[in-house]
Amino acid sequence: MTEYNANSIRAKILRRKILQLIAENYVLSASLISHTLLLSYATVLRHLRILNDEGYIELYKQGRTLYAKIRDNAKQIQILNSELEGFKNVSGKPILTKDETPKEFGKKDSLTQRG
């Protein structure tokens, strides 16, 4: 079984966002991805290289500009999506909902009550 920590989960979620952005536009430059996601160019480049090594995207240069495009391998993208679905429930649900607020929060301390 694969173990995940908070950083690896965030990295996978970020790579999924990058993949979605590229898929919506078919081809994007690394600098445009950086600007769109408000990330440093170095961070985007590191994640693009990982996605390239894993076979999700293809990187190529035109002049001094680095571009990324989605490879035609829907199976690997489906595997990534299924892995991330497991994290959805963990990160998407608030710790306490309005109805689950502990009753102690609503009570006044005996020292603050006057009467």
From Swiss-Prot:
<dbReference type="InterPro" id="IPR011991">
    <property type="entry name" value="ArsR-like_HTH"/>
</dbReference>
<keyword id="KW-0805">Transcription regulation</keyword>
<dbReference type="GO" id="GO:0003677">
    <property type="term" value="F:DNA binding"/>
</dbReference>
<dbReference type="GO" id="GO:0003700">
    <property type="term" value="F:DNA-binding transcription factor activity"/>
</dbReference>
<protein>
    <recommendedName>
        <fullName>Uncharacterized HTH-type transcriptional regulator B-115</fullName>
    </recommendedName>
</protein>
<keyword id="KW-0238">DNA-binding</keyword>
<dbReference type="InterPro" id="IPR001845">
    <property type="entry name" value="HTH_ArsR_DNA-bd_dom"/>
</dbReference>
<comment type="function">
    <text>Essential for virus function.</text>
</comment>
<keyword id="KW-0804">Transcription</keyword>
<dbReference type="Pfam" id="PF13412">
    <property type="entry name" value="HTH_24"/>
</dbReference>
<dbReference type="InterPro" id="IPR036388">
    <property type="entry name" value="WH-like_DNA-bd_sf"/>
</dbReference>
<dbReference type="InterPro" id="IPR036390">
    <property type="entry name" value="WH_DNA-bd_sf"/>
</dbReference>
<feature type="DNA-binding region" description="H-T-H motif">
    <location>
        <begin position="30"/>
        <end position="53"/>
    </location>
</feature>
<feature type="domain" description="HTH arsR-type">
    <location>
        <begin position="1"/>
        <end position="91"/>
    </location>
</feature>
